[in-house]
Amino acid sequence: MMCQGFTVVNSHVFDLPFNSILIVILFSDVDDGSTVTDFLPAERARGITIQSAAITFHWPPPPPDRNSAASLLAQASSQPSHTINLIDTPGHADFTFEVLRSLRILDGAVCILDGVAGVEAQTEKVWHQAANYRIPKIIYVNKLDRDGAAFGRTVKEIASRLHTWPAVCQIPWWEGGNGRFIGVGDVVALQGLRWTERDGKTVKAVSMDELATTTDQRFADEIRKARVALVELLSEYDDQMVEKYLECDEDHLAIQPWNIIESLRRCLLNSFSPLVPVYAGASFKNIGVQPLLDAVINILPSPREADDPEISIGTVNGGLKDLIHGKMSPEAPVCSPVKSKKAVVPARKSKTAIIGNLEACALAFKVVNDPRRGVLVYVRVYSGTINRNATLFNTNLQTSEKAPRLLRMYASDGIDIPAIPAGQIGVILGLKHTRTGDTLVSYIGSNPKTGPPAPLNTLQLRPIEVPPPVFFASIEPHSLSEEKPVADALALLLREDPSLRCSVDEESGQTLLSGMGELHLEIARDRLLQDFKAKASMGRVEIGYRECLLSPSSIETAMFERETAGRKGKAGCAASSAPFAGDEEALAAVATDTEYSSHQDGNRVKVSVVGSTGLAEETESSGSPLPPYLPLNAVYTALANGAFAALARGPRHSYAMYGTNVSVTLDPALHVFGNETTSGALSSAARLATQAALRNAAAQGGTAVMEPLMNVIISVEEASLGPVVHDISSARGGHISSLDDADVIEASMHGGKTREDQPFIDLRKVYAPPDPFAASLVVGGEDPGMPGSGNRQRSITAKVPLKEMVGYLKHLRSLTGGRGTFVMSVDRYERMGGQREKALLRELSGV
């Protein structure tokens, strides 16, 4: 509860007794490494959340004593105990996929803000990701007990940076107005809540009359002011609140607390309402945590009230609830006349029966390799119940697996359970093939091999989107014998974290591991070496440079003559090489009827046979200059393959060639020697002739080094635009292609909305209580949260050498205060500048 992440929850009424796990989570401390959900050694060592962790508890618990916070709140609400499935997610930008896969399966979210830092860069990013999934959210401003905490400023930043109207439901209670943080003012219930002990076990409810007469008159006045602002804001988006306001003779303070709670709930359930409840507290001292949990129960939706899960079945998209209730046809409608009603009714009943036998539907959102238990698959059940030993059909992989054991998780600990019902999160042990994002269904009477009948065997819940990687490093096994163990360990690591990607560079032979950032890969390396015991090291990425010719060569002739396995092979050919523009138009140039042309990796090879009239003669044996056992097509392919093999290694620096045109000529009278000339011999002759032509061209005009040029799209705030553009164009040798408003990028970040579609937030109308020493928060008379401070998003499109983009993410975050992001892809190869080429060659020679 006290991490600086984006905590996401789902809840539903479940009448079970409370157990002691709640006390552990409330009184753990991220600062000393005792947080229950931060159980990895790296998390405890660094004091941050690295991977999402699930924990299930009940709220409200049985009151331990009459004066406790839980007792006071339980007496006020008299509500049954609820089951809360809480997932603690990381706050660091490198672990954004952990947030994404958690957001995908939750019903509500609690956004925890640092009261000192305010709305940070990663907060904005995750907020928009949650909006993309239309998840109801509440905000908890934490760490108000620290020096420099400013609740009012944070509320203003919520409005300006998150583009939402903050509905302030609590205000901080500062002792004496400017002293230490001692409690909160409950704007909904019109009372003060003061935590009287340092550990937060005891809370005292102070009425408005007592506040006004004996304790703090200014604080009581501020609570009334906050109540007026809250009712006015709710009236803008909830007609029923307007009716209650009129029923109470337009008295904001006369409206009952439950009426305000119901109004807040209605606004949150409306995904188009730009309103978010805001609460205050200090988790280190346990101040405000219990009212926050009450808000989770009272305001956030239960699984029954959440949006219908998106599914695809066959070619049809829709909602899972609509499918189960018969409101969605599992097949696309066929526009054909119905000839007989009797022929239609049985088919309709058959479809209904098929859907009725669907026992459960769940989404696997996380896979973890536990050293003691094996592979743990975290699932969210959307429909029905998954029972122990049930046969689950994976509709993505079209395979069936047994679920021999089910667990309810408490961070790293698990308790065996007989079933996972709808709306719950659980863990399945024993699944060998299931991956993150796979849909699992249980069907009554299904065939274990073929699964449920069509079209239910194609039922898939909305998948989890994996962001593209932006940071790369190489993985090198310590020896050849360690290659397979390292590959197996990487496969386990990638199954756990799909945001990691593994690939093999065909030119360098390096195994490349890519991820979301430097810290992400650092943690992956530690897990690979320490948890999976892989014997490998992580190094830097080697850039795949290319070599190009600067002048054409003369025609070079080569003869190949060698005896292999007792059979003599002999052939010859002539070849010449020349530079050419390796663009699409040049590569797409069509050969004539008498020559063969092929292009590969930016190079082109043309093959001609003296005396040949083209492939058409292959059907006419007469008149061909080649012997019958050498088809013209086979000769073309063999010669081209030999030339391309020679182009894989340049004459000067051994880089692969790029932008090279090779012409290979075969004269059957000079280069074919009866049965000794085979396809293999021709290929070897073409390789030797091409290598000779490349050496000749290099001797006459030299070669140049080419480097991969990346197409980079950078999203930054306008205030950071100048430094980023200057860095790209000067320090990194890039070329700026365009500077645009980031409407397209914002549309993807804001759930399909551009900035013009976002609600206009007039900060003058946003209520925020005064902060202690508020004058020091405004510098030069400008509110940092006000519009016009340079927080408009801009998009930079540039062409930058790949070498300069290695490790760029960390530098970009430094330039933009953590608010810059980028994506890149290979655009083309470009010749290196003189100074850069000299530096590279010095590096290669070890000077």
Which residues are covered by each model-predicted region?
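P-loop NTPase catalytic nucleotide-binding module
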Residues: 117-358, 362
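Conserved structural-core and active-site-/substrate-pathway-adjacent residues in large, well-folded domains
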Residues: 1, 47, 88, 102, ...
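Gly-rich Lys/Arg/Thr-decorated short loops/hinges at beta-loop-alpha junctions or inter-strand turns
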Residues: 77-84, 103-110, 237-245, 465-477
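Amphipathic alpha-helical transducer elements in NTP-driven molecular machines
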Residues: 33-34, 47-52, 92-99, 103-106, ...
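A conserved hydrophobic secondary-structure block that centers on an alpha-helix together
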Residues: 89, 109-122, 502-503
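Accessory interaction regions appended to the cores of large information-processing enzymes
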Residues: 157, 163-168, 172, 298-301, ...
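P-loop NTPase switch module centered on the Walker A-proximal segment
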Residues: 1-112, 168
